């Protein structure tokens, strides 16, 4: 079990509070000027393909000393061991947390309730390999004897965000199959997708552990009805639908052959499920071997996380720096900014990963916390973001720590595109860190021919204060393996922060109330009768909706 230590009651927290009084005046220009080796001291390499530069943060050696002390005092190392050893650290649901077992390429035993889960994990992987080989190779035929050309993954949350993010990030490795993802219960999503595919050559993956998820099953039934409108015979469903689920009776009743049902386990959380059978769409998109490379990459980061001392542990360092901003500097959000168009859903994926994990106000003792927990996560690819929201990051009143991610080698080395992209990547972190003072601004204006009055009028608006913190994560190239490294790195960062904040990171009770109320409201929308059973606002909205529809 995880310890229940209030971080604010630790000696390290008190030391950080005292340290912050002087640290508020830290200036990155001074920190770099005072230490020519700062980059070397505050950067880390992961293997030969990833460099993490955290030198442009508002930290010094004393800051890190206290942060590592906080990690030790909250018994982080014991928590890491507890997770990897299969303890039921998801205590509110009584479950182990073992997405790491899904990518345990060492195949060393991982025990849950005394039973090694690896034989079951490997059996599902073998089943996925056989299935993907048949579909990709054209051996799997539709009801008219044609090979499959399109895959439609129907899921929501972790059953959609992860596979979609990865298949987009690994698009350069894509084979001939066309991938489509449907998640929203808004009928527009499924209807627009079905316009693009042919029932004779489309395979649907229904991703729902329970096979009862409202949004997923609504879309699944619509897809089946659309398919049968052409195929006619219910028996043909088995050739065009597969299930990522554990509910065999419901899968069979839907018309899916349970031989084409791919299982996963209750110790796999939805937002960590891309490593499981939920990743079948990934394997179909890029091939089984590349899917295994993705798992290998994540396993490499798992090994680093488990075996590396805290002071050199990349996910731990990133997590602690995040706590420094969240709990001491008062930062409310973090931006993830990948300078790679293929990674355009990476921030959205970790928006769920972080905010669903650590968006909690009750600690592991069951008491409301008296400190900040999970940050708001957001971001877009560069350079698009530069022309959208970087203005606020540079000159706004909010402190927004940013992670900049970029590959050194592009999959599309067209002309000088990548050099221009990377020049912006390097320039932005430099500009955020060091800014431009008023003296420099005025000198530039004078050089541009402005008179003294014009200089005085415009100069204040062109000043960049700098001192905006960033991490730079430079990757040799985005490959299945390095993408696996990156995803696991962020997963473990989230876990570390949850441990230190004394919250449960692997449940998500906050999604339940809205579902319950929606189920109560749904039958009230069936006719035109006036509703009065809710508060005046909800009643008014429902009745206005009915009036608009009438």
Swiss-Prot record:
One of its GO terms (molecular function) is glucose-6-phosphate isomerase activity. It comes from the Bacteria. The active site is at residues 356, 387, 515. Its main location: cytoplasm. It is found in: Cytoplasm. InterPro entries: G6P_Isomerase, G6P_Isomerase_C, Phosphoglucose_isomerase_CS, SIS_dom_sf, SIS_PGI_1, SIS_PGI_2. Its EC number is 5.3.1.9. One of its GO terms (biological process) is glycolytic process. It catalyses: alpha-D-glucose 6-phosphate = beta-D-fructose 6-phosphate. GO terms for cellular component: cytosol. Pfam families: PGI (PF00342). SUPFAM superfamilies: SIS domain. Pathway: Carbohydrate biosynthesis; gluconeogenesis; Carbohydrate degradation; glycolysis; D-glyceraldehyde 3-phosphate and glycerone phosphate from D-glucose: step 2/4. Keywords: Cytoplasm, Gluconeogenesis, Glycolysis, Isomerase. The keyword Acetylation does not apply. Belongs to the GPI family. Catalyzes the reversible isomerization of glucose-6-phosphate to fructose-6-phosphate. This is Glucose-6-phosphate isomerase. The gene is pgi.
